[in-house]
């Protein structure tokens, strides 16, 4: 039974509704000279990436899961002409660095597009060749090789990061890198204007105007009482504390503890969910480097102290022990990516072997290419549903990264 359009009180409850984004033309606007700035290491082949993503969506639908698409919800959210106009203004305001004062010309282009085509174009980016103009600004003479007025958003198929469902509410996130910062504008408009969400009084635990960075890949809902959040390159301690204070005080929240876990700052450890995901009541996939750090980790258990009327923070250095304590489980099993092998583990970690999507307790969706990790999961009693991902993985994200649960059954 659900009480609204958002209900996520665990990482493992039966998945009922999920938000995806099908890869689009934004991937074809990736070029080698600008890969770093757009946070990509390689260029996926769009046709095959779409086939792989369609297969992923079909697997979820075959499991009885309702699949919603970000791009479709966004288009349905701007049917009102005033909302559409404000949306365009907001997008252009956040793209001012690249549009070079050509708002009028870009708006003219947008005026010819249907709502769905407009959303697709904003996501894909606007090439300079699409708008024929004479140079009127010095920067255009000096920087005329840069090909975009509106940068593409190739990371959008990772719907986990711009937002996160927590309990009955969501965080609408301020992303760390400028290349991704506009992404959360879509969910912001969806929550405010889409018929499915707008009148549901969905709590925003963190909004996108928060001055501190937080990303959904670092946000794990361990239970109705406990959140785990990675302190990473992309999620700040300040954002975590702000979120903790908000959910501790709000009567619509059931959360009592926030476990903040410091992870290394590197692309291999991009978010907490690339190094640790919950897959059953007592099992987690884990990067072997985290296991080697046991006893030397920085873990902080944040709770609200009613007497002091403030938060209190307890330090721990053991991940396994901390998880057992906060989840009240006698024995937690941490399953290493690639069986902890120096070669297999590193290869499969690079290919998101620990970034699994749990669709119900003990059942996960993974990339088929991570065969060592998948076999190890099966040996631990986990049902593994494999999907192809040779092109999708080029964006450095797995099934959890590519999905945002909106409704899970309570455990």
From Swiss-Prot:
Its main location: cytoplasm. InterPro entries: Arg_deiminase. Keywords: Arginine metabolism, Cytoplasm, Hydrolase. The active site is at residue 401. It is found in: Cytoplasm. One of its GO terms (biological process) is arginine deiminase pathway. One of its GO terms (cellular component) is cytoplasm. Pathway: Amino-acid degradation; L-arginine degradation via ADI pathway; carbamoyl phosphate from L-arginine: step 1/2. It catalyses: L-arginine + H2O = L-citrulline + NH4(+). Pfam families: ADI (PF02274). Transmembrane segments: none annotated. GO terms for molecular function: arginine deiminase activity. Its EC number is 3.5.3.6. NCBIfam families: arcA (TIGR01078), PRK01388.1 (NF002381). Belongs to the arginine deiminase family. This is Arginine deiminase. The gene is arcA.
